[in-house]
């Protein structure tokens, strides 16, 4: 996974649960199957958190939870600004053959206000349409290209059409108030055995420990 996308994923996952310890982040990301769609090596998650701390985008708090030492992470203002910038770029950059940045941004869409999500979807749709127009212009001179190259171009156009349909539908859903975005009351409840319940209790305890200094 590219460094920028790793930063986006780790910053976003910390923002969801902060304060949160490294084991919890690792477990949560693996429950998202990031090792498959994002090609994240589970062992790299801890080093990624350390790297972001060194960049000043995360703050590490070394606490004693009961009798157990634990390191928990929160995002800094620098980290939140970096997340917002990278999220917007990932949403608006169209690369049909390498959509990982876009997919990463979608996984973290609930961390973004509704108006900003709507703007990013509109910008991506405009960028996609511009790319299709360029591709159509290039196809006008492909009559002498090998057949398999023209077949590849047909595949790209098909991918673009499928994504365009999805973008239009999702844009309509966002404007209609659907989906759960930043600052809104969730419309779903996790299962009783969801680890998030334990993480929420840990979060409250970590906040108290941090406040004590």
Predicted regions and their residues:
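Basic helix-turn-helix/winged-helix DNA-binding cores
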Residues: 1-97
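Non-transmembrane amphipathic alpha-helical segments
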Residues: 121, 128-139, 160, 167
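Amphipathic alpha-helical dimerization/coiled-coil segments
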Residues: 84-133
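A structural signal for alpha-helical segments
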Residues: 40, 67-70, 116, 144-155
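Charged, low-complexity intrinsically disordered regulatory/assembly segments
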Residues: 139-213
């Amino acid at each position: 996974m590219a460094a920028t996308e790793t930063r986006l994923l780790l910053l976003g996952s910390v923002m969801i649960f902060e304060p949160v310890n490294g084991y919890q982040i690792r477990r949560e990301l693996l429950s998202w199957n990031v090792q498959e769609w994002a090609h994240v090596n589970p062992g790299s998650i801890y080093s990624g958190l350390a790297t972001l701390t060194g960049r000043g985008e995360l703050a590490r708090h070394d606490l004693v939870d009961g009798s157990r030492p634990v390191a928990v992470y929160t995002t800094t203002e620098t980290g939140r600004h970096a997340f917002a910038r990278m999220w917007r770029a990932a949403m608006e950059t169209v690369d049909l053959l390498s959509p990982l940045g876009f997919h990463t941004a979608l996984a973290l869409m609930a961390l973004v206000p509704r108006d900003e999500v709507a703007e990013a979807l509109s910008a991506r749709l405009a960028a996609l349409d511009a790319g299709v127009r360029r591709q159509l212009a290039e196809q006008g001179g492909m009559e002498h290209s090998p057949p398999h190259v023209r077949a590849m171009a047909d595949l790209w156009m098909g991918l673009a059409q499928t994504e365009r349909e999805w973008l239009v539908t999702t844009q309509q859903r966002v404007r209609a108030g659907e989906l759960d975005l930043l600052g809104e009351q969730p419309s779903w409840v996790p299962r009783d055995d969801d680890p998030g319940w334990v993480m929420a209790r840990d979060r409250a305890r970590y906040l108290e420990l941090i406040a004590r200094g």
